[in-house]
Amino acid sequence: MIIAILGTGYVGLVTGACLANMGHTVHCIDINIKKIDNLNKGILPIYEPGLEELVRKNVQGEKLYFTNKYDIIEQCDAVFSAVGTPSKEDGHADLQYVFAVAKEFGKHIRKRSVFISKSTIPVGTTDRIKKYIELELSERKEEIEFDVVSNPEFLKEGSAIEDFMNPDRIIIGCESDYAHLVMSSIYKAYSDDKFLFTDIKTAELIKYGANSMLATRLSFINELANLCDKVGANIKDVANGIGLDSRIGSKFLNAGCGYGGSCFPKDIKALIKTGEENGLKMNIIKATEETNNNQKHILYNKLYNGAGKVEFPIKTIAVLGTAFKPNTDDMRDASSVVFINDLLNDELKLGPFEKIKIYDPIALNYAKKVIGETNEKLVYCNELDNAIIDADVIVIVTEWDQIKNINLEVVKKLMKGNLIIDGRNIFDRNKIEELGFIYEAIGY
């Protein structure tokens, strides 16, 4: 089958590479000429484990192509929309890119084809997409059959290829037997028990519901962790005890310094707006967002607590991890950004800080763009040891393996101080305190 992917971000690039690997001929289209030129040179715009190799393999196998021309749509049996849907200032999903590619689909189809939304879009958006396509065909004075489908993605950054190749489920919202047949053909490598065929609006809402449920679990466990800090309980054991209930399970019950990324924050905002437009307050979802926004300031508050337990001034801070999660370079809505801004603002007057040393094994270049390089206090470190040397305090923001597996005895020798703020609860409190560290974690 000949397939086009509109957009070459996380979703588009992973989807295109994986579909090509399944035997389809895939053309990835993006209006960013520089990005397409780089992709044709083998330079990817994102970091995702295994993706560079998968792209190279399928480009060499003449199954995967990159272009900035929409003309290839004329040949395609199916066209996936994988463009961004960022949040507007008021919280609504910005759908301008979705409608723009829908128009291009309407301008270029020459035979019956299926327009498939991979992008996360609010309920009812696919109906609007259909109208945009119909309008383009009307202006062309052409009557060409087409179908619209909602096929939301459920890819986790850091394990996106595995998620695509071995999905928990494949959600497909469609209205015609033809669309059903095309989607079944695209995903013919998967067993029938992976599929849930439903109506379009239901498919759209499943995606928002899933992300909101996961975000709610994280905010819930973080609230419990904060209570543990107050009453002297252990959030690790609390989460374990809760997760042992088969009705609940253990996933997404790791307390920390807040969630971020390209999905949860914007999808929460969009779902709240969808509820408001339909006369619903969405109180639980609002509380999830508020709790997470507050949680991102906890590292600065923990630093304040820790500063009261040490006898030395805190001059140099090592911030370990900037990406919103490990195994990605994504800095969108990352807790590290909030923490570093808290340090620079220093409302509690913990400073003056002389150096804020920042380390991330993958996302450092993106961190420089997001956080900036103009403040002379900020020192970006390519090596973990360089960030730790002479630090009065270490603050762990992202649970990279490089950080989790660090030799704490070596850390003790390299540091000037002995205070560790653990925003992801990666260390064993007893062991770390036996080594002479003062340890501040989240509910633990």
Language model segments and positions:
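Structural/interface elements that position substrates and couple domains in central-metabolism enzymes
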Residues: 1-444
